[in-house]
Design a protein with these regions (language model features):
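Active-site-proximal, substrate-binding regions of enzyme catalytic domains
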Residues: 40-68, 75-76
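A generic structural signal for short hydrophobic patches within well-formed alpha-helices
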Residues: 9, 40, 114-115
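Alpha-helix C-terminal capping segments
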Residues: 23-30, 62-64, 98-100, 117
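Short, well-structured N-terminal submotif of metal-dependent ribonuclease cores
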Residues: 1-35, 48-58, 130
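Active-site neighborhoods of divalent-metal-dependent phosphate/nucleic-acid chemistry enzymes
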Residues: 68-110
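Short, flexible helix/strand-to-coil boundary loops that buttress conserved ligand/catalytic motifs
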Residues: 13-17, 47, 84, 118-121
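Acidic, PIN/NYN-like endoribonuclease modules and their adjacent C-terminal/linker elements
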Residues: 1, 66, 70, 101-130
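Phosphate- and divalent-cation-binding pockets in alpha/beta enzyme and binding domains
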Residues: 42-43, 79, 116-117
Length: 130
């Protein structure tokens, strides 16, 4: 089971350089994908900020029903500060890390900062999938 990082979805939604490989990853993992509530909100913020509300609406209609949206348990929020201190990850990444750890998920990402937690959870980088 995979926690798909925000950057994978944004790469496709914003038609960026690696959109084709990211789309293949998303298509290949239908039914095994998890999206954090934080990622969903981040995608919305970025798309709205860039005047792409129509893309967000399409995403919510086409993609969101195919993924499981998960949130960090309330009692684990207190662990985010210690996890940040231990790993050096920023808030976005430490949230993804802790949610993946809680649910026993592998993170699929393009964010090299996740190298810092490879010894704690399974991380797969897009370039290793190609």
């Amino acid at each position: 089971m995979h926690l798909i990082d925000t950057n994978i979805f944004l790469e496709v939604l914003l038609s960026q350089e690696k959109k084709d490989v990211c789309k293949k990853i998303l298509d290949a993992n239908i039914g095994n994908q998890y999206l954090s509530d934080f990622s969903l909100h981040s995608i919305g913020v970025i798309l709205f900020k860039n005047g792409k509300e129509n893309i967000f609406k399409k995403f919510v209609v086409d993609v969101v029903p195919k993924v499981e949206i998960i949130t960090l348990s309330k009692e684990l929020y207190k662990n985010l500060v210690d996890a940040k201190k231990d790993t050096g990850l920023d808030f976005d990444d430490v949230y993804q890390f802790k949610i993946a750890e809680e649910y026993g998920l592998e993170i699929i990402t393009m964010d090299k900062d996740f190298d810092r937690v490879r010894d704690k959870i399974k991380i797969t980088f897009v370039e290793h999938i190609v």
